């Protein structure tokens, strides 16, 4: 069967212009105009999606099939082009019957054109074919427009759904244009409003806990650039002005305290000859406290010295992915669970803004994994937030899973974050030694987010940084009172 792409090529119909008109009309629709005004960050993300729309429309037109009636009419037209005028005259009745049978828009006009001329000349033959071609072009253009209109309605419906989702989550997850773009890409999945309302709920909870939000931001910024002195610095010459007392006798201007032996007052010099005062003399000499004559003529001169020039290279510390392990034991339920989930949501926000990855592992008796920064990040976040914390505590398995993940090349610069109350058994010696090796050899950093003031110091000593957020009732009341 004839494809629409082939028909467009045969009739020289430009579908590109039709596609551009459709996209312009879509972007100018009132729904998008209101959305762009309300969420300007997402405007750039949607605009960046236009090439994908354009390619999808091209593919749709390319694969579309032409209706059988139009295909048969096109074939008849092509055959008629090959006929000479005498042959065309012979075939004309069959051509008119075929057009009538196919309900072609050209059928009635073709018969009127033939009836208006008693003789079929070569010029009439050419005119007949030209008008027939125009009729086919109109039909092909109409078919293109119908398909594009169907695609426009479908695309507009999809965009509206994604706009609704992105508009709800933009205040929670999009901190800049980069995050807005990644959020828009994630919104392509099939999600119901009831699903992503869970993210909205924890986003509102996070806003009610500004200390927890600031803690996540501090952890995200913890890798700062540091200056590294260079060992290969060369010696360079520096000029400096130094003051030296004149060595020739000059006019006495007064007295001063100094260590100038040549200008000592006689009483000071006399103390040097007294045994009991000799040490006192030397003390005052070292401290430049001897009374001396002050002379005119102290001179300044330029002195040339050589010293190594201090150059510093700024070693930009890479902000790698987050590998977050969350304790889902029973002691982490209730308010602790809410804080842990909201903290992970804050890390997801940072990861989207800084183009980092955010990988969540829930540890209890087994380990469940979620990647919140991937193409299915919103769906993964919803599944994570739906989890209930009712398991046991197996901190050793958590560390083993982290260390296994850090062996991969794509995670070599990751920051490991463990969220727990750290009320657990001590870590095995092999786990402790392996963590210290990763810290020493590969400069991996382990962060602890302590949800309790009663965590075991022996466990927490292994971490590079400990971020404390006490969820006890007293601490919660104090934080609320300070706000």
UniProtKB/Swiss-Prot annotation:
Q: Which SMART domains match?
A: VWA
Q: Which GO terms describe its cellular component?
A: cytosol
Extract the signal peptide range.
none
Q: Which InterPro entries match?
A: Uncharacterised_CoxE, Uncharacterised_ViaA, VWF_A, vWFA_dom_sf
SUPFAM superfamilies found in the cross-reference section: vWA-like (SSF53300)
A Pfam family annotated for this UniProt entry: VWA_CoxE
Does the keyword Plastid belong to this entry?
A: no
Compartments in which it is found: Cytoplasm
Record's keyword annotation contains Cytoplasm: yes
Q: Which residues fall in a coiled-coil region?
A: none
What domain of life does the UniProt record list for this protein's source?
Answer: Bacteria
Q: Which UniProt keywords apply?
A: Chaperone, Cytoplasm
Entry similarity comment: Belongs to the ViaA family.
HAMAP family in alphabetical order: ViaA
Q: Which PANTHER family match?
A: PROTEIN VIAA
What the protein does comes down to:
Component of the RavA-ViaA chaperone complex, which may act on the membrane to optimize the function of some of the respiratory chains. ViaA stimulates the ATPase activity of RavA.
Q: Can you state the subunit structure given in the record?
A: Homodimer. Interacts with RavA.
What is this protein's name?
Answer: Regulatory protein ViaA
Which organism does this record belong to? Answer: Escherichia coli O81 (strain ED1a)
